[in-house]
Amino acid sequence: MFKSGFVTIVGRPNVGKSTLLNYIMGEKLSIVSNKPQTTRNNIQTILTGDDYQMIFVDTPGIHKPKHKLGEYMVNSAKESTKDVDLVLFLTNPDEEIGKGDKFILETLRDKKCPVFLVLNKVDESTQDRVAKSLEMYSKEFKFAEIVPISAIKGKNVDVLVELMKKAMPEGPKYYPDDMITDVQEKFVVSEIIREKALRTLRDEVPHGIAVDIIQMKQNEIGTYHIEVDLICEKDSHKGIIIGKNGQTLKRIGENSRYELERFLRSKVNLKIWVKVRKEWRDNQLLLKELGYKANSKK
């Protein structure tokens, strides 16, 4: 009997959703950074075995939106929980149950599919804190399974995957065996560059950063030539991104090139320009150009 289904991963920003997905897949398909709200698009990732296929939807964190981009991210996350076969609610034992957690759980209240509580980052917590967190969440919601894990170290992730397989309904193989994602190569490239920018800049520049790929082509010997605009919202941010004598931008480029060559398995020539687009996160036309398309309301 072949089993297949759709799995969505939800939780507050920065609880480790993308890290978990990347560990399961063994591929860097979803942007990972220490800043919240780094995932901006739903990414369908396909895990296929001999007798199963699970299609994961990696979502932005659900939060109170502050701008048009924030509204897109929240609507995208909510939309992803519709018509799925399993929901993984990811949280952190060292944080109290907040309004954000309760808001997410309330949106899951009427789901007919199973909801797993996945307690991440247990390696950074204490046994008492983990036990207290499990008790608190058990009172808030009736979970089909409760699994403590460490996504970054892979602890108990194999147990989680086995439980997920069991939860999948009987179904067809939706995608070919060798297909691991439904996103275009350019999207992954832009996400890698954005991650490196966020990591390099740390808290110096907020989330008003986007990557627009101007050109991406491969020559006859296999080398990729990639030109991108790194978009920010303020002139002051542009100066920070470039850095003294261009050193910060150079570091972003070097880190991006290394990761891109691993992903593309080829040599990469990368050129990055920094452009200011004031209040781009509230510009619906520019958001569409950058690939952020709002989900249709059902």
UniProtKB/Swiss-Prot annotation:
Annotated localization: Cytoplasm; Cell membrane
InterPro entries found in the cross-reference section: G_ERA_dom (IPR030388), GTP-bd (IPR006073), GTPase_Era-like (IPR005662), KH_dom-like_a/b (IPR015946), KH_dom_type_2 (IPR004044), KH_sf_prok-type (IPR009019), P-loop_NTPase (IPR027417), Small_GTP-bd (IPR005225)
Residue segments, region G2: 37-41
Broad class of where this protein is predominantly found: cytoplasm
Chain residue ranges for the region called G3: 58-61
Binding site for GTP: 11-18, 58-62, 120-123
KH type-2 domain ranges (all copies): 201-278
Region (G4): 120-123
Residues annotated as domain Era-type G: 3-170
GO BP field: ribosomal small subunit assembly
Coiled coil: none
MF terms in GO: GTP binding; GTPase activity; ribosomal small subunit binding; small ribosomal subunit rRNA binding
Region feature (G1): 11-18
Pfam families (UniProt xref): KH_2, MMR_HSR1
Cellular component annotations (GO), alphabetically ordered: cytosol; plasma membrane
Membrane topology summary: Peripheral membrane protein
Keywords: Cell membrane, Cytoplasm, GTP-binding, Membrane, Nucleotide-binding, Ribosome biogenesis, RNA-binding, rRNA-binding
Sequence segments annotated as region (G5): 149-151
Record family assignment: Belongs to the TRAFAC class TrmE-Era-EngA-EngB-Septin-like GTPase superfamily. Era GTPase family.
Subunit structure: Monomer.
Chain's role: An essential GTPase that binds both GDP and GTP, with rapid nucleotide exchange. Plays a role in 16S rRNA processing and 30S ribosomal subunit biogenesis and possibly also in cell cycle regulation and energy metabolism.
UniProt name for this protein: GTPase Era
UniProt source species: Clostridium beijerinckii (strain ATCC 51743 / NCIMB 8052)
Gene: era
